[in-house]
Curated annotation (Swiss-Prot):
Inhibition of MYOD1 may be partly due to the ability of EID1 to bind and inhibit EP300 histone acetyltransferase activity. Residues 31-50 are annotated as: Disordered. InterPro entries: EID. Expressed in all adult tissues examined and during embryogenesis. It is found in: Nucleus; Cytoplasm. A motif (LXCXE motif) lies at residues 150-154. It comes from Mus musculus. This is EP300-interacting inhibitor of differentiation 1.
Length: 169
């Protein structure tokens, strides 16, 4: 029971950090913040403007017009991503809990298979006469139906009562 509670808690944590694709859009948005413009909608000209101006002023002479790759590579290497660490920690706990649940399931399945195998082995050793079983079943069904139709239950009950009274006296 505690394992299920832990799984539910971890599932809720992982949902908070999940990435969602906006319907009708081709790019992904992280988190729950307000949606910004898609790449085709917007500020590419604004971003390209200062970068191109810096290239023209000589700040990045070797980059020229294609500054995007070199400009952003350096800060990504130095920046620590706490969301990613928190997400990987939650995912690690979820995967550990799932592995434990899988082990429990496998143990249960093996025990069920062993029990089923033992039952089948006992059935093979015990003699079962199908013909005798069918005869007994048929006779019980016929006798029950006849006693219901003819009201023989009352007759049988009376006879049993009479025999018991005779035995007691």
């Amino acid at each position: 029971m505690a394992e299920m509670a832990e799984l539910c808690e971890l599932y809720e944590e992982s949902n908070e950090l999940q990435m969602d694709v906006l319907p009708g859009e081709g790019y992904m948005e992280v988190g729950r913040g307000a949606r910004g413009p898609a790449p085709e909608e917007g500020p590419m000209e604004e971003e390209a403007g200062p970068a191109a101006a810096r290239a023209q002023r000589g700040l990045f002479p070797e980059a020229g017009a294609d500054l995007e790759g070199d400009e952003f590579d350096d800060w990504e290497d130095d920046y620590e991503f706490p969301e990613e660490e928190r997400w990987s920690g939650a995912m690690h706990r979820v995967s550990a809990a799932l592995e434990e649940a899988n082990k429990v399931f496998l143990r249960t399945a093996r025990a069920g298979d062993a029990l089923d195998g033992g039952f089948q082995a006992r059935c093979e050793k015990s003699p079962f006469d199908q013909l005798a079983f069918i005869e007994e079943l048929f006779s019980l069904m016929v006798v029950n139906r006849l006693t219901e139709e003819l009201g023989c239950d009352e007759i049988i009950d009376r006879e049993l009562m009479l025999t018991r009274e005779e035995e007691t006296t």
